[in-house]
Amino acid sequence: AWSLKYKDCDPPIWLLNYLFDRYEHNIEQKLWIAWIYGTTYHLPTAWIIWNEFPDFELVGLERLKQWNNDNYKRLRYQTDTKYNKGYLPQQFESYKEWIANKPQLDKFAELKTFDNVWNSVIKNLYKFGRYSTWFYLQTLHECVGLDLQPSTLKLEDYGGSKSHRNGLCYAL
């Protein structure tokens, strides 16, 4: 009923928009939280990580490793990202390298289009496969406000997940 009423099959999107508005996050904070959410696909865990490490540019890798190890058993990841659990430091390292010591927004301005961002994320961000990349880009579009419109639903991708095709068939 929630999804039909709000025309959203992913309630965390609504909640992220509420939190961004309520706490008046700036664009860099939104981008950082969107990436954390992309690694976990579990908004409570993403929010906890963000509260511990609120500034992307100030995250110390050794502290992140220690914190991740200390909190491993308590952190929850969504089923689709369960194999990311425990790899937050490595994922962060790849994200930091990808951003390349500049504002996060500059990276997206440089890449410009959905397809360019998609290809770059898949290639450069550790443990971001098709599914993680899709909902990460969805979050960037729907919550952060980046103009990332997919050029395809990836229905021709027979080598990976079938859930997006099955879901579309069910919806039709």
Report the location of each language-model feature.
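Structure-specific DNA junction-binding interface
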Residues: 1-88, 142
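Short acidic alpha-helix initiation/capping motifs at coil-to-helix transition points
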Residues: 4-14, 110-117, 158-161
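Generic structural signal for hydrophobic core residues of well-folded globular domains
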Residues: 34-42, 121, 125, 140-141, ...
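Helix-hairpin-helix/helix-loop-helix acidic hairpins
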Residues: 76-126
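Accessory, usually C-terminal, subdomains that scaffold auxiliary metal cofactors
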Residues: 138-172
